[in-house]
Swiss-Prot record:
Protein's name according to its UniProt entry: Multifunctional CCA protein
Domain HD stretches: 228-329
Residues annotated for ATP binding in this entry: G8, R11, R91, R137, R140
Quaternary structure, from the entry: Monomer. Can also form homodimers and oligomers.
Superkingdom field: Bacteria
PANTHER family, sorted: MULTIFUNCTIONAL CCA PROTEIN
E.C. no: 2.7.7.72, 3.1.3.-, 3.1.4.-
Recorded domain comment: Comprises two domains: an N-terminal domain containing the nucleotidyltransferase activity and a C-terminal HD domain associated with both phosphodiesterase and phosphatase activities.
Length: 412
């Protein structure tokens, strides 16, 4: 039997990038051979084994044939006659269809090295169209390799468009869409993922709420980029640039969904877009089964981001209630995530990317002030329900003093 390193590890090795995961394909072996050598079977749909010592994945070389719709609609065939070339041709992109043997010799039957050199993302064969998840995977690779100058081959983008138009994307499960999208959101250029999906016509099928933002105008004095969709992707790029968490990136992505629902007669103003956004954000999160914590921050940012922009003019009581809704006393990290998302929104505007956002520091200081006031600070004779009422009173008074000090400093 022959063992080859395949896929992403070989691709990244040839690019000179670091890699963690190693996947191997085994040619000329049977499940019985693998078990006899101590490998542990883990594959449900096809024979995949874990190495007894390294726990790395070893898959028997296989072919596959489309038998139904969607990601799971395949029949797999594996035996000792399946060659390395047979296994590699079923892979998505030529740059992922390269193998390396244990002596370091490269096997590249489909031109992957040439495409690496020319910075091209190209499908291996027409079988690419049999798996709709590959549309999302290619979009994610476009995001990952964007800084290195990679582009999708025109014929591959055309095939992705055909797949999007065919309705095959509807067969993808919410879990698969979210898994691929959450991985894409953590790329350094996550905006390219969504732009690529839009370019191939997949965005309107998978994320209609986001697709609807493109072409919707905003007031140019506040948004020089004008287009709501462009603003959304610019804001997302700010979150990526700052290396923020998945929760923050997703919240930034959906913060303005309400603008797509603004009545035409009100454009380019978007009064009450925060309230209008609650329904589409909720729908998107429920459809994709977005984790609860991620959904909660997204809804908070959607509902409250204008208050963060206007924070210095908020009345102390209004600011306290905002902090309360963000669960400032139990979850200060959520307030921080909220501030980060709002700052990305403010900086996701053409020509304003580097403008200071003093509201962020103001919010952080306000958070520290209310968190510093404890029960021990109250008079000893306060009992029962009065304790909670007086804590609120003390916190609002402290915020009022903070606001006055801030205004005095800014006017001095």
């Amino acid at each position: 039997m022959q063992v080859y390193l395949v896929g992403g590890a070989v691709r990244d090795y040839l690019l000179g990038h670091s890699y963690q995961e190693k996947d191997y394909v085994v040619v000329g072996a049977t499940p019985e051979h693998m078990l006899a050598q101590g490998f542990q079977p883990v594959g449900k749909d096809f024979p995949v084994f874990l190495h007894p010592e390294t726990k790395e994945e070893y898959a028997l070389a296989r072919t596959e044939r489309k038998s139904g719709q969607g990601y799971h609609g395949f029949q797999f065939f594996t035996d000792t006659t399946v060659s390395l070339e047979d296994d590699l041709i079923r892979r998505d992109l030529t740059i992922n269809a390269i193998a390396m043997d244990q002596d370091g010799k490269i096997y590249d039957p489909y031109g992957g090295q040439n495409d690496l050199e020319n910075k091209i993302l190209r499908h291996v064969s027409e079988a690419f169209a049999e798996d709709p998840l590959r549309v999302l995977r290619v979009a994610r690779f476009a995001a990952r390799y964007f800084p290195y100058g990679f582009q999708i081959a025109p014929e591959t983008l055309q095939l992705m468009q055909t797949m999007a138009d065919s309705g095959e994307l509807d067969a993808l499960t919410p879990e698969r869409v979210w898994k691929e999208t959450s991985r894409a959101l953590m790329e350094n250029h996550a905006d390219i993922y969504f732009q690529t999906l839009r370019d191939c016509g997949a965005l309107k099928h998978l994320f209609p709420e986001i697709d609807a933002l493109f072409g919707v105008p905003q007031r140019p004095e506040y948004h020089p980029e004008v287009d709501c969709g462009i603003h959304t992707l610019m804001s997302l790029q700010q979150a990526c640039k700052s290396n923020y968490s998945l929760d923050v990136r997703f919240a930034v992505l959906v913060h303005d969904l309400g603008k797509a629902l603004t009545p035409a007669k009100e454009l380019p103003r978007h009064i009450m877009h925060e309230e209008r956004g609650i329904k589409p954000v909720t729908q998107l999160c429920e459809r994709l089964r977005v984790p609860t914590q991620t959904k909660q921050l997204a809804l908070s940012v959607c509902k409250e981001h204008l208050k963060c922009h206007q924070i210095m003019s908020l009345k102390p009581g209004t600011l306290w209630r905002l902090l309360q809704r963000l669960d400032v006393l139990r979850r200060p990290e959520r307030v921080e995530a909220f501030v980060q998302a709002c700052e990305c929104d403010a900086k996701g505007r053409l020509g304003l990317e580097d403008r200071p956002y003093p509201q962020a520091q103001y919010m952080r200081e306000a958070m520290q002030i209310v968190r510093s006031i404890k029960v021990q600070d109250l008079p000893e004779n306060i009992k029962g329900a009065e304790i909670g009422e007086m804590l609120i009173q003390y916190r609002i008074e402290a915020l009022a003093e903070f606001k006055n000090q801030h205004q005095s400093l800014s006017h001095s």
